[in-house]
Amino acid sequence: MLKAVILIGGPQKGTRFRPLSLDTPKPLFPLAGRPLIAHHIEACAQLPDIREILIIGYYPQTQMEGFVGDMQALYSSSNINIRYLQEFTALGTAGGMYHFRDQIRAGNPRAFFVLNGDVCADFPLQELCDFHEKRPASALVTIMSTEATRQQSLHYGCLVFDRSSGAVSHYVEKPSSYVSTFINCGVYVCSMDIFTVLAQIFHSRGQEYSCQAFCNGNGNGNGREQGHIKWEQEVLTPLAGTDKLFAMPVPNWWSQLKTAGSAIYANRHYLGLYKKTHPERLANVGIKRGEGDGSLICTVHPDVYVHPSATVHHSAVLGPNVAIGPGVTIGPGVRIRESIVLEQAQILDHTLVLHSIVGRGSTIGAWARVEGTPSDPDPNKPFAKMENPPLFNNEGKLNPSITILGCFVQVPAEKILLNSIVLPHKELSRSFKNEIIL
């Protein structure tokens, strides 16, 4: 038996994903018509030995229970139990696993997967599991690894490993100088003995906590709970060079979802994966899937996802890389490319939407133009990953990026919105360029 753990953090995480995360938890943001971590769950469910998937974070239970209920119903026939375990406070990337160790160990699984909730990938979980089980008995963790450019590697966990055995000899999280172009993908398979290591860290932290609390009178002086454990720095780094940490390099597509701009890039790749795994989800032939009459949607340039409840005028043109959410209305002559349109949005007649995300319940008037600047990886650099630049450059000016409309934004007719970010519930009255509209 196998289990999987998906780590999703909490509300104070994912701030760079605003304004999209202001009304929807980042792990539930839809990519290619499915919530982000639904893709993780789908990958885990492909493994015949998976019996339970645990989502660990500190989002309120009320924000996650609807999604978990939907997933449980979807995979009930596969005999997979899906649960959300809410941390009482932020416990770090490994603290939550240790806190819920009894739930993870219940049923005596032979190993369990750990997936960071903010990564997007074509997850080769079966290959990762097979690789791990062929390692020596001392192996505790196997990391899924990929290559990045020399400069970009500094933004990730870097590892040095033996290419024949996979044994990791050195691991550094976000090094200040070059270590290796092989990086940590945030996907792991762990032996159950890893909890012995976590227990040692927890108890040593307890002694440190007690000492600091005594010296400081009350708190421990750093604002962290005793159970707060950093997976990368406190677990992986010490395991390197002990023949207990291994890595499996993969050529598969992989990306992090850190900023709103990276959502469009991830959306494109998940739509591309559908062609291989779920072609029935795509509207690439211009036919609305799930409709009894098989009526023509509109002109489609693959790959495009259209929710069955969306209304699209036959003269509209969609794609490539477009996802249309539930209840969306798209009027005559509309052109949408490289964009995500969320539920209940309205795109009125002859509007152009390029490299943008249109928030839930937003309306764009007729003959308007909403356009952003793509932030894709450099196609001329092998292994290049998504750049996640800050909002502002060194001169204090807004960096060009995709255009984002928060929920329930009103864009009037015949206006232009270029490289701008609009916070929720704003009613615009003029055109904007390179601005954040508060």
Curated annotation (Swiss-Prot):
Entry's Gene Ontology molecular function annotations: enzyme inhibitor activity; molecular sensor activity
A Gene Ontology term for the protein's cellular component: cytoplasm
Stretches for region C-loop: 373-402
Listed SUPFAM superfamilies: Nucleotide-diphospho-sugar transferases (SSF53448)
Gene Ontology biological process: biosynthetic process; GDP-mannose metabolic process
Free-text comment on this protein's domains from its UniProt entry: The N-terminal substrate-binding domain adopts a Rossman-like fold and has a binding pocket for GTP or GDP-alpha-D-mannose.
Role summary: Regulatory subunit of the GMPPA-GMPPB mannose-1-phosphate guanylyltransferase complex; reduces the catalytic activity of GMPPB when part of the complex. Mediates allosteric feedback inhibition of GMPPB catalytic activity upon binding GDP-alpha-D-mannose. Together with GMPPB regulates GDP-alpha-D-mannose levels.
Family, as annotated: Belongs to the transferase hexapeptide repeat family.
Oligomeric form and interacting partners: Component of the GMPPA-GMPPB mannose-1-phosphate guanylyltransferase complex composed of 4 GMPPA subunits and 8 GMPPB subunits; the complex is organized into three layers, a central layer made up of 2 GMPPA dimers sandwiched between two layers each made up of 2 GMPPB dimers.
Protein name per Swiss-Prot or TrEMBL: Mannose-1-phosphate guanylyltransferase regulatory subunit alpha
Organism encoding this protein: Drosophila melanogaster (Fruit fly)
Gene for this chain: Gmppa
